UniProtKB/Swiss-Prot annotation:
Reaction(s) catalysed (UniProt annotation): a quinone + NADH + 5 H(+)(in) = a quinol + NAD(+) + 4 H(+)(out)
Domain of life according to the entry: Bacteria
Annotated source species: Mycobacterium tuberculosis (strain ATCC 25618 / H37Rv)
Organism lineage string: Bacteria, Bacillati, Actinomycetota, Actinomycetes, Mycobacteriales
Name of protein: NADH-quinone oxidoreductase subunit F
InterPro entries: ComplexI_51kDa_subunit, NADH-UbQ_OxRdtase_51kDa_CS, NADH-UbQ_OxRdtase_suF, Nuo51_FMN-bd, Nuo51_FMN-bd_sf, Nuop51_4Fe4S-bd, Nuop51_4Fe4S-bd_sf, Soluble_ligand-bd
Family: Belongs to the complex I 51 kDa subunit family.
Amino acid sequence: MTTQATPLTPVISRHWDDPESWTLATYQRHDRYRGYQALQKALTMPPDDVISIVKDSGLRGRGGAGFATGTKWSFIPQGDTGAAAKPHYLVVNADESEPGTCKDIPLMLATPHVLIEGVIIAAYAIRAHHAFVYVRGEVVPVLRRLHNAVAEAYAAGFLGRNIGGSGFDLELVVHAGAGAYICGEETALLDSLEGRRGQPRLRPPFPAVAGLYGCPTVINNVETIASVPSIILGGIDWFRSMGSEKSPGFTLYSLSGHVTRPGQYEAPLGITLRELLDYAGGVRAGHRLKFWTPGGSSTPLLTDEHLDVPLDYEGVGAAGSMLGTKALEIFDETTCVVRAVRRWTEFYKHESCGKCTPCREGTFWLDKIYERLETGRGSHEDIDKLLDISDSILGKSFCALGDGAASPVMSSIKHFRDEYLAHVEGGGCPFDPRDSMLVANGVDA
């Protein structure tokens, strides 16, 4: 094993392995970042100062788009009084559903109180007195753990009325969704939270102006909010000492697939896949890297030529993809790229809400063409049809679900067109899917 140039920086994940790490007692035993100390510090500051700290830290959204968190908070109208004043809301998007994305669920399971503390600080900053954590309904253990942690926070006086004697009140609700991937899109999430079918809204108006119940609303990802307490305690300079100039700080990288030690690796933004694979023991023994996703199934594929691309928003963007949720799905040479993209296409076809014609119809036809290619009934024209349909989807719907379906299609043809041609000219898939399978303990099937 070589020496890693970029050290891991466990901050959010530092105490995940502690016994009963999810309890309030354990959270408050931490040495450097003792639980709820950041909240106590924030409550002594004016709300606008808290926003300024988060803005100056350079924290960017960890849910995919990478928008500046402090800037998003500052969009909330401040100073409204009288009849014109509307309540402000904070919503945490914990509807983690995309293939390959798996960082928020272990975070909430291991240390739910860091999320709750971040929620209280963020709500105080934007002057919200009601906050919601919207969780994917299937993850029942996460829901139970969050409910227990919220109950502990209420009992300790960190939630409810007059928190810490500051005069600030906050009610926090943990809400279970019904399992629709589309509800990970922020405006569809708001519709679901209001009791309607989850579908993306036309913007403008943006949630900061007309969000939940038509009121100013901030929507942030779990990891984004969980990063706030350490910034309040550690300070701007400490946070900016990690990562890159435009993408400062630390983040969770999720390695899965054909890797020796899959899991969550917390590191500064800008680390490379080569370095992360070094920490993870490399690609599984006897195999080599073929392609990978930098941010889950909705981001354009990269290849072994991109091992040294800095994994920050600018570096990955310059390489032709997106950092997204930092879900690094690793595929070795035994994987059929056509089969992999077909599986993702089936997912997006199933999860399309049907509101926008390009996405609804486009994902259906993409799936039909992939079925032909995999079963030996494809043609050379089908490859061009995939690109044509993807172009008809890209950027032509209310949300980015259709874009996510088109991205792996277009990028896989760009990098592996010969493999598509082999499916046409060879009468079907030339790969044996058993070669790429893994059993539960990571040993070849």
